[in-house]
Amino acid sequence: MPKFKAARGAGVQEKHAPLAEQILAGDAVRAGTREKRRGRGTGDEEEEYVGPRLTRRILQQARQQQEELEAEHGSGDRPAVPRERTTRLGPGVPQDGSDDEEWPTLEQAAARAGPGYQAEVVVDPEDERAIEMFMNQNPPARRTLADIIMEKLTEKQTEVETVMSEVSGFPVPQLDPRVLEVYRGVREVLSKYRSGKLPKAFKIIPALSNWEQILYITEPEAWTAAAMYQATRIFASNLKERMAQRFYNLVLLPRVRDDIAEYKRLNFHLYMALKKALFKPGAWFKGILIPLCESGTCTLREAIIVGSIITKCSIPVLHSSAAMLKIAEMEYSGANSIFLRLLLDKKYALPYRVLDALVFHFLGFRTEKRELPVLWHQCLLTLVQRYKADLATEQKEALLELLRLQPHPQLSPEIRRELQSAVPRDVEDVPVTME
């Protein structure tokens, strides 16, 4: 027997009513018991009211969930900072095309960075003394952006004056006084900058043909660390690689080295500027790492701080291979071993040309009379551990002979063990014969 279906709108009490009453009830028109809820846009009905008990329960549940999240992420000991209310006119659209990041104080920024950023760098005195033995005792004078710009302007002015006097005798064009006034004002802003928007006149510097001359007017050596980060972000994004290399080498690198030398640590904003500069890895290697190694005066502290950027960031293999080839061929300093070891630890598939250059780099110390630092032996151990299967038989034998000439009591046995257990790349696999 099919299931009985109640009539639409009929109550439960009418299910077993007499047939005559059911027929009469079906013909009659009854008002529906369901009330239709209208949308809130009509404005005819009052808004729903949440009672105090329900409000307390909602707040209690939200507080419990927040405490669980803070306990899970390890931030339960820090009280939440209430958000300040701001009044905005119009839609929330930025006034210009690019939004500048606002940086907190150094303590808050270092706390946000987590354990990856170390404010204080611990340096082993013995390693520092060993590296100083291989430093350049008569380093060349460091050239700043001001020196380069003044030389360039003098040469350009002499050249243009000669050409113009020969052609038409017109005077050399100089910067408009209004331009000088604007960028002197930019200089004042950058010397006190902490956070917020940057002047638009500064943002357009990368698009100018004489951007180095304009940049010299703003006096980069007087910028704050936060201004240096913002400038690096702008120039790394808008300059070509060759121009970005000049900015890194003439502006960013001297500022980083001066900050480390003065405070024995690196400002957090300058550290983030070094990371942001890796947006153009070719310019980063040519403008920061290679000049740092070629100077011959790179300290252990500088090598550790700059090397941490290599460890944390992803770098294309071609740029890293070219940098390793360049470092292996230049005159040795203790910092070279640190950078080579960090690049080897990234486990790239290196070309044989780079591996051969690295092996030749180590074999050049067979006649070295000075005691080699531990960093040199660690770099050799890393090379053997990562690429022992890519070494040729002659290279393997030459490295074993090198260990006899330049031994280390702890590391040399480990290096020898790795070399003896490796199968050279030029040894063909012998097929197994089945009897």
From Swiss-Prot:
Asked if the keyword Metal-binding belongs to this entry, the reply reads: no
Q: Which residues carry this modification: Omega-N-methylarginine?
A: 40
GO molecular function per UniProt: snoRNA binding
Keyword annotations for this protein, in alphabetical order, are: Cytoplasm, Methylation, Nucleus, Phosphoprotein, Ribosome biogenesis
**Is Metal-binding included in the keywords of this UniProt record?**
no
- Write out the biased-composition intervals (Basic and acidic residues): 71-87
The segment annotated Disordered runs over 1-102
GO BP, one annotated term:
maturation of SSU-rRNA from tricistronic rRNA transcript (SSU-rRNA, 5.8S rRNA, LSU-rRNA)
Q: Name one Pfam family in it.
A: Bystin
List every position bearing Phosphothreonine. Answer: 154
Q: Which residues form a coiled coil?
A: none
The record's subcellular location field reads: Cytoplasm; Nucleus, Nucleolus
Similarity remark? Belongs to the bystin family.
Oligomeric and partner information: Binds trophinin, tastin and cytokeratins.
Role description: Required for processing of 20S pre-rRNA precursor and biogenesis of 40S ribosomal subunits.
Q: Quote the protein name from its UniProt record.
A: Bystin
Question: Species name for this entry?
Answer: Bos taurus
